[in-house]
Amino acid sequence: MKMKKMLFATAAAALALLGPASAQDFPTRPVTMVIPFAAGGPQDTIGRIISQRMSELLGQQVVVENVGGAGGMTGSKRVADAKPDGYTMVLGSVGTHAQNQTLYKHPLYNVLTDFTPVAYLAITPI
């Protein structure tokens, strides 16, 4: 129950950040949320909850796309290569945005230059 409350509070805080964006004519088409892991895991669950509420608030469909592989680098790379117009986002994690950058000699993307943070959604305890 405590986790549900925390997730809801985090989601509400993240969605509150969408207020300034609503002043613009955005979105005019569906938004894609890439989850760089297989369906059914914790990132997928959080992403689907968030995307449903985002769809309601934005008045536009938010499509969840699971692109697993290479410890999350495959899906994250897809977003890094996408047009930076806000219509493609990644639900990153410590693995995709910190560990992979240090574990691999030549990571497929640079988290400091290829992504713009939007919201901090959840904490995964050890």
Task: Mark where each language-model region is.
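Bacterial N-terminal signal peptides
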Residues: 9-17
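Bacterial N-terminal signal peptides that target proteins for export
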Residues: 1-10
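Short beta-strands and strand-loop turn motifs
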Residues: 34, 125-126
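N-terminal (or domain-start) structured segment
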Residues: 23-116
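Short Pro/Gly-enriched coil loops immediately N-terminal to beta-strands
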Residues: 113, 118-125
